[in-house]
Amino acid sequence: MLSPQAVVFDMDGTLVDTERVSQASWRRAAADMGIVLPDSMLNDFVGCSIPNARTMVIELVGDVQLVDRLFSHQAELFLTMRDEDLEMRPGAFEAVRALHDAGLPVALATSTEREHAMPLMERFGLAQFFSTTVCGDEIERSKPEPDIYLEAARRLGTRPEACAAVEDSVNGARAALAAGMVTFMVPEWAEPTPEVRTACVGILQSLHELPALLIG
């Protein structure tokens, strides 16, 4: 059993099933505008920053103005679909509550902006368990850079190496690993690459498995 001093969770795709909603909104937005986005590109969007995703689509489509309209349309669809269809990932509430109740400080490190992230955490009853939260609009470099995890550790007052991180995406796992954290991956859309699979301490089927690995 591992004994971290704190646990840092990603949000999108890890605690809440935003990746399913995001992929559906991308497919619908692209279809509305007559654009075909390959499944491989949609999978690459998992854990990807908006600027990086935009660059990928511009390289595919070649029309910057069309891409700007696509991203605007997708953002509107995503917010509507998120409010209607979003669910927690299996075991998310139970895992976060169990770690908190065992006395482990729990933090959130999400690329989503605070104004969008915190209402979701309140909605699902998770906000009450976090000792600190770091959001995408509060850091300079997005995942796979380690900034957000380093900042979470700083706010927790804990060395990054003494923290466990929980992620669903390859880019997110790379960020946590680069920060020096013991990293678990709970993949849904994006299978871990061989190097990430080797570097992570565990690849979990669901968050139901996590408490036993950290608190027994």
Where on the chain are the PLM-derived regions?
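Active-site neighborhood of HAD-like aspartate-dependent phosphohydrolases
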Residues: 1-43
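Asp-based, Mg2+/Mn2+-dependent phosphohydrolase catalytic module
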Residues: 1-5, 97-100, 113-216
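Short, acidic loop-to-helix structural element flanking the phosphoryl-transfer center
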Residues: 3, 80-108, 114-118
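Conserved SAM-binding loop
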Residues: 15, 88, 106, 141, ...
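Helix-loop "lid/cap" segments that line or gate small-molecule binding pockets
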Residues: 29-30, 49-63, 120, 152-153
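Metal-dependent phosphoesterase signature
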Residues: 36, 41, 58-97
